[in-house]
């Protein structure tokens, strides 16, 4: 993950959870303060579901307007948490229509599902027919599961805003992320969402941003930056965010590499010695001592997107044959049958010592 300045163009598709407190502008301002650029547009009619967006001319026209870097998809706040029967009949087919529209525009666009938060006291209107949503935690768990299902189903990413909220509430339940209706976000909730989106889109921490709304104090802003960023960056693979990552195990001149990348289609390994591989988890043996720069490149979205991780491998194998010096008192040298013979090269000999130990040696012509 590089820290270079980036420019991303993003379309936000959602409803009031996105437009209250102008979430896209909050993300834009955080990015600007950290040297990055977010260009954005929105289609966020109040209360819109995925089904409504799937037939909304404005939404579909904006999807096709240009080759976006990301298109954020936020469902109506309750619908992904409802019963499996409802979700399968209403949410998933509409999400498929939106994904199809995105892919019809360009396979290079990355869909980014907006995992929202559970209502403060659960979903009272759906509690009786579907008890899992009776509480905040129950509703949050259903939202988490369904948004991740959709992300993995469509090889898309997920911005885990709801899980950042859960983490914040666990740390300090007195910081009210909700507005007075216990559903929509307060400015604290929207700022936390913005920090989470910044980390999801740019794959960089929002910690250190000099921007926060004037109604938030600096200590609280810093805490929300930490929570949003760590929720994303500590678990990129969990949220299916495209990322190149590797680990390795070295034994002498042989190195076994393990690919830990997420949401990728293919990988290319450059071992730094002129050799490459497209294997998932290759093992490579170096012919000479030296320090090698190994680059793993992960590729996705019809080869439009690439990410890389670089590690340094040092090989230092001694090739010298050293004379073994025995401080012990030598009694005799024998062949392998125990017959005493004078010292010879190129054949195995047994060295018998006064302390009763026996060593097998062979000395080679240099």
Name each model feature, range by range.
Residues 275-276, 301-308, 357-358:
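Short, exposed coil/turn segments at beta-strand boundaries within extracellular/luminal domains
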Residues 259-261, 271, 284-288, 292:
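Residue-level recognition of secondary-structure-to-loop junctions
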Residues 61-183:
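Alpha-helical cap/lid subdomain in secreted, periplasmic
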Residues 240-250, 304-341:
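Residue-level detector of functionally pivotal "anchor" positions at catalytic/ligand-binding pockets or at interdomain
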Residues 177, 184, 188, 194-245:
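Conserved catalytic region of serine esterases and O-acyltransferases that act on ester linkages
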Residues 264-284:
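Surface-exposed, flexible coil segments in extracellular/virion-facing regions
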Residues 7-11, 17-98, 107:
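Conserved SGNH/GDSL esterase-like catalytic core that processes O-acyl groups on lipids
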């Amino acid at each position: 993950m590089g820290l270079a300045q980036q420019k991303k163009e993003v379309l936000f598709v959602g409803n009031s959870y996105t437009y209250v407190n102008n979430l896209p502008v909050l993300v834009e301002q955080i990015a600007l303060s950290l040297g990055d650029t977010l260009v954005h547009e929105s289609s966020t009619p109040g209360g819109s579901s995925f089904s409504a967006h799937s037939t909304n001319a404005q939404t579909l026209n904006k999807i096709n307007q240009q080759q976006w870097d990301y298109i954020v998809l936020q469902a109506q706040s309750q619908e992904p948490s409802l019963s499996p029967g409802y979700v399968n009949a209403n949410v998933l087919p509409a999400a498929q229509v939106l994904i199809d529209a995105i892919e019809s525009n360009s396979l290079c666009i990355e869909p980014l599902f907006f995992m929202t938060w559970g209502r403060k006291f659960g979903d009272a209107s759906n509690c009786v027919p579907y008890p899992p949503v009776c509480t905040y935690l129950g509703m949050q768990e259903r939202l988490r599961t369904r948004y991740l299902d959709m992300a993995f189903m469509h090889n898309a990413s997920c911005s885990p805003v709801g899980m950042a909220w859960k983490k914040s509430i666990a740390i300090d339940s007195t910081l009210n992320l909700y507005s007075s209706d216990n559903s929509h976000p307060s400015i604290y909730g929207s700022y936390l969402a913005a920090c989470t989106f910044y980390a999801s889109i740019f794959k960089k921490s929002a910690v250190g941003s000099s921007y926060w709304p004037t109604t938030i104090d600096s200590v609280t802003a810093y805490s929300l930056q930490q929570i949003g960023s760590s929720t994303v960056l500590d678990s990129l693979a969990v949220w299916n965010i495209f990322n190149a990552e590797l680990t390795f195990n070295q034994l002498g001149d042989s190195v076994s590499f393990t690919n830990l990348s997420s949401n990728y289609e293919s990988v290319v390994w450059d071992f730094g010695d002129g050799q490459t591989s497209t294997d998932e988890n290759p093992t490579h043996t170096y012919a000479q001592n030296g320090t090698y720069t190994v680059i793993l490149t992960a590729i996705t979205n019809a080869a439009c997107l690439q990410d890389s991780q670089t590690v340094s491998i040092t090989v230092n194998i001694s090739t010298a044959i050293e004379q073994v010096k025995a401080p012990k008192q030598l009694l005799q040298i024998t062949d392998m049958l125990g017959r005493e013979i004078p010292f010879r090269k190129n054949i195995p000999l047994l060295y018998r010592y006064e302390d009763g130990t026996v060593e097998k040696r062979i000395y080679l012509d240099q």
